[in-house]
């Protein structure tokens, strides 16, 4: 079959990374896969085994820019027929919808109502109306059950138009990459956070909890340097205890070497880093945010979940996780079972075959 996978760019976010893995996985199964981006920007390489196409050197994000991109996408896909077009992230979803191509599915990678809740009231109303108009008539694939529930309850999407397909993970490949040499990794014990410096990711909460926990470990942040983040670290007096280690194309040695991985977001869709850290044998603590962490951390692993926006609870959970033994192997295997690559790729093939 022929697949076209489309997103804004290859920036360092989880949605782009997951879409690239879907593309590579489908290509490895012998399918013809075109990976298309609006603009040439980002940290990730083009997915292996795919034809890579860029619509513009720099994408205009306004009314006219979206329509120019949609025209280019329409022309390119008309000349390169496909069995399924999968777009992800709202900007790319809008461009793909404007292109009016057949067999188009939007992959929803975040909890949209939680994203909207952060906005001022007037802007939140406009954003909600925009999403209802965009997603109200298209088939959707949510990355977690929480995202699917959000689409149905908050945006009025009919349940029969929303499927759930988790992000695919090749655990053998993750563990092999985790074993690669990593001379940049600190020799001293450390706690790890992976995620761009953005309000959603709550570095302010992380730093407040880390300062309060008073742990012997360093805190390592895998994110590009940012003046705002540096200033925030200084305000907490943590300049000597926090390392900004930039974006890492291979974060897995950093995960494997960490005493603990912390996720403290206000909202997610299906946080890849929790699954990847568990696959690397690392303890995890996470805010119980919408959506994904509670689906991943079930049973005894749910002890690592804390309320959102509670630095005291996060500090206590960090101390408790570091004092406890690592989770038993059978618990980790059970937690990871729903997230293997094969079930996800099977599901995408089934959607393409049914269109």
Regions found by a protein language model. Give the residues of each.
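Aromatic "clamp/platform" in nucleotide-sugar-dependent glycosyltransferases that forms part
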Residues: 247, 266
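Short hydrophobic beta-strand element within catalytic cores of glycosyltransferases
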Residues: 283-287
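A conserved mid-protein helix/loop that constitutes part of the nucleotide-sugar donor-binding site
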Residues: 16-21, 189, 193-212
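N-terminal strand-loop element at the rim of the active site
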Residues: 5-13, 17-64, 147, 224-227
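Membrane-proximal helix-turn-helix segments that form the acceptor-binding/catalytic region
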Residues: 71-75, 122-140
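Conserved acidic donor-binding segment of nucleotide-sugar-dependent glycosyltransferases
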Residues: 299-312, 319-325
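A short, active-site helix/loop in glycosyltransferases that binds the activated sugar's phosphate group
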Residues: 137-162, 169-171
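Short His-centered aromatic/hydrophobic patch
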Residues: 86-93, 108
